[in-house]
């Protein structure tokens, strides 16, 4: 079935599934992790995630080249079944209290999660959400804009070059995520996330310097560093700010929703600027928004507190 309504429906289902995947994996990982092991495991998860994305993209390109685009759908179906089989192997003995970030220092007490409205008083968490929303408002449109510029300059190579950008960036994300697992507990979360955020305005500025095909693809590789760090650090920071509240899952989902809104607005904003002022102005505007994201993150304190297990939301 190839009707617009059917495609829209299936894509909506895919959007729902992808939006809950990362928070669910983070919660399961937390519920299965020993104390102090969450950082390494979440970084490992992200590394495997990016490796899987890269391999899937390569396989999709090869299959599409030899058997046409329809082969990609069979590949995705096979991978989905393999994912289900892997999910069935996840141990069932998940500590549900730990998975939701609920601490109980008194074993005799029955811990209860804090009211959801109390999370709105968690100013660092709100500031983190705003920072992430600005980051994705600036970031989401950059690859589409680069793809459009590549298509204008090299119509015959636009699709292969865009695919190369995506695959190469995914490979860069692997060591970036692994670095989070190694350094997040030593250096703190904020310095690493600042590195990821600071790369974004740099990318926006670098895109304006040249329309050369090799230059655009090379600059896009920087996206792998920022995205690799972001995906691994965000769950750690949310856990830091909500530990003991029992609302880790809700908070991570809320932050994900907020930055998803930023990402959804990004392409429309960039397209409007391109229409009225051109690509250079669009990249500069996105770089400016990325700068605001960096400024907001600078206002956030370091979230990691060694050997601390707060029972109420962190305060500014």
Say what each PLM segment does:
Residues 64, 176-188, 274:
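Helix-to-loop junctions at the C-terminal end of transmembrane segments
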Residues 93-128, 315-316:
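Juxtamembrane intracellular "pre-TM" segments in multi-pass secondary transporters
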Residues 122-141, 221:
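Pair of pore-lining "gating" transmembrane helices in MFS-fold secondary transporters
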Residues 6-20, 215-229:
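Hydrophobic core of transmembrane alpha-helices in multi-pass small-molecule transporters
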Residues 191-206:
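Structural signature of the two symmetry-related core transmembrane helices
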Residues 72-88, 283-298:
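Symmetry-related core transmembrane helices of the 12-TM Major Facilitator Superfamily/SLC fold
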């Amino acid at each position: 079935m190839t009707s617009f309504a059917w495609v829209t429906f299936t894509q909506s289902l895919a959007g729902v599934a992808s939006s809950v995947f990362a928070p669910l994996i983070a919660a399961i990982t937390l519920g299965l992790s020993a104390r102090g092991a969450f950082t390494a495991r979440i970084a490992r998860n992200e590394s495997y995630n990016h490796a899987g994305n890269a391999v899937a993209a390569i396989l999709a390109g090869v299959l599409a080249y030899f058997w046409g685009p329809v082969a990609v759908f069979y590949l995705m179906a096979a991978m989905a079944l393999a994912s289900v089989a892997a999910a069935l192997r996840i141990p069932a003995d998940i500590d549900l209290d730990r998975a939701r970030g609920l601490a109980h220092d008194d074993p005799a007490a029955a811990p209860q999660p804090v009211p959801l409205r109390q999370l709105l008083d968690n100013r660092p968490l709100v500031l983190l959400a705003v920072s992430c929303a600005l980051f994705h408002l600036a970031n989401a449109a950059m690859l589409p804009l680069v793809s459009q510029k590549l298509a204008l300059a090299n119509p015959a190579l636009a699709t292969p070059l865009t695919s190369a950008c995506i695959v190469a960036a995914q490979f860069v994300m692997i060591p970036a995520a692994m670095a989070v697992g190694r350094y997040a507990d030593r250096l703190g979360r904020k310095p690493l996330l600042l590195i990821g955020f600071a790369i974004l305005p740099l990318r926006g500025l670098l895109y304006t310097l040249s329309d050369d095909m090799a230059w655009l693809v090379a600059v896009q590789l920087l996206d792998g560093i920022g995205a690799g760090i972001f995906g691994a650090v965000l769950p750690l920071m949310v856990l830091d700010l909500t530990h003991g509240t029992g609302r880790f899952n809700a908070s991570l989902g809320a932050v994900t929703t907020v930055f998803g809104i930023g990402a959804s607005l990004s392409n429309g904003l960039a397209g409007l600027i391109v229409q009225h002022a051109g690509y250079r102005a669009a990249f500069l505007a996105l770089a400016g928004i990325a700068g605001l994201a960096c400024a907001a993150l600078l206002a956030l304190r370091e979230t990691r507190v060694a050997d601390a297990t707060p029972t109420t939301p962190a305060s500014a």
